[in-house]
């Protein structure tokens, strides 16, 4: 069997932690920021962990990370 290819778009958007969880960044941070509060923009800078229902599908896209 050949190796599974890594989905390059997913590889740029997600990374794995040391414990095997998948990290992601928040959306809504690139433009139209004037209507968002300072607190909202600050919280959007923080990373987030992928939810359990999505973990299996994303893990298939990035098998070697």
UniProtKB/Swiss-Prot annotation:
Residues 1-41 are annotated as: Disordered. This is Large ribosomal subunit protein bL35. Gene3D superfamilies: 4.10.410.60. One of its GO terms (biological process) is translation. GO terms for cellular component: cytosolic large ribosomal subunit. PROSITE patterns: RIBOSOMAL_L35 (PS00936). InterPro entries: Ribosomal_bL35 (IPR001706), Ribosomal_bL35-like (IPR021137), Ribosomal_bL35_CS (IPR018265), Ribosomal_bL35_sf (IPR037229). GO terms for molecular function: structural constituent of ribosome. Keywords: Ribonucleoprotein, Ribosomal protein. The lineage of its organism: Bacteria, Pseudomonadati, Thermodesulfobacteriota, Desulfuromonadia, Geobacterales. Disulfide bonds: none annotated. The keyword Ribosomal protein applies. Residues 1-26 have a biased composition (Basic residues). Belongs to the bacterial ribosomal protein bL35 family.
């Amino acid at each position: 069997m050949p190796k599974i290819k890594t989905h390059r778009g997913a590889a740029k958007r997600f990374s794995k932690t040391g414990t095997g969880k998948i990290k992601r960044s928040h959306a809504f941070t690139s433009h139209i920021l004037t209507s968002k509060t300072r607190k909202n923009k600050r919280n959007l800078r923080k990373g987030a962990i992928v939810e359990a229902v999505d973990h299996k599908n994303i893990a298939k896209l990035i098998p070697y990370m």
